[in-house]
Amino acid sequence: LNDHLSFNFDKFVPNQNNILFQGEASVSTTGVLQVTKVSKPATRSIGRALYAAPVHIWDSTTGRVASFETSFSFVVKDEPEKSNGVDGLTFFLAPANSQIPSGSSAGLFGLFNSSDNKSSNQIIAVEFDTYFGKTYNPWDPDFKHIGVDVNSIKSIKTVKWDWRNGEVANVVITYRAPTKSLTVSLSYPSDQTSNIVTASVDLKAILPEWVSVGFSAGVGNAAEFETHDVLSWYFTSNLEANPA
């Protein structure tokens, strides 16, 4: 069994053979991973893109748990420019061979089909959420945000996201198994500041031993139009030695 996995996409190619495409995710001729539809109308568009090989995230025989790091660049672009945003992008870990649940469009990001916090979901996600509004998304804070989601669309931890429409965002997500610490950092090259959120997450208690990793995004039922494009993606994971 492979206890270590690393891959790196500087760019993508159409019909990339080591990416599983679900819903309306695709790769453009220019090498961009487009997680949702890029042409109007995109109402209720939903997509996911997963690395084809499963990741060994913990081992029941030894009790070992993986530490991982992933970095990626993405662009979320809205039209018209002053729109509210609909709805956002996630990086997530879910059971291997996971599919898009029915009823999971818009602010449920193709991950959940309700706001229920069910342990059977077996999902950890980092959401980059451009839409907030108590009418449709009562679980959200009152600002655009980065959130850590555990089995539920209601984040266990959020931080305000200074979203820049159409700008490239650089993200680094690290998970340290010994401390059960998940840290997310997002920055824009045009700016020296970062939006950072850290949460305590026990992978072994939430996820199955083998998971799929990737991106998901959803567009709501609105006049606004939003695209969710991933430009590059690096991931590495390693099962740690036995805990003392």
Swiss-Prot record:
Q: Which residues bind Mn(2+)?
A: E127, D129, D142, H145
UniProt xrefs under InterPro entries:
ConA-like_dom_sf, L-lectin, Lectin_LegA_CS, Lectin_legB_Mn/Ca_BS, Legume_lectin_dom, Leguminous_Lectin
Q: Which residues form a coiled coil?
A: none
Single GO MF annotation = carbohydrate binding
Q: Which Pfam family, giving just one, matches this sequence?
A: Lectin_legB
Which keywords does this Swiss-Prot/TrEMBL entry list?
A: Calcium, Glycoprotein, Lectin, Manganese, Metal-binding
PROSITE patterns from the UniProt entry: LECTIN_LEGUME_ALPHA, LECTIN_LEGUME_BETA
State the function annotated in the UniProt record: Di-N-acetylchitobiose-binding anti-H(O) lectin.
Its family remark reads: Belongs to the leguminous lectin family.
PANTHER family attached here? CONCANAVALIN A-LIKE LECTIN FAMILY PROTEIN (PTHR32401), LECTIN (PTHR32401:SF45)
Q: What is this protein called?
A: Anti-H(O) lectin 1
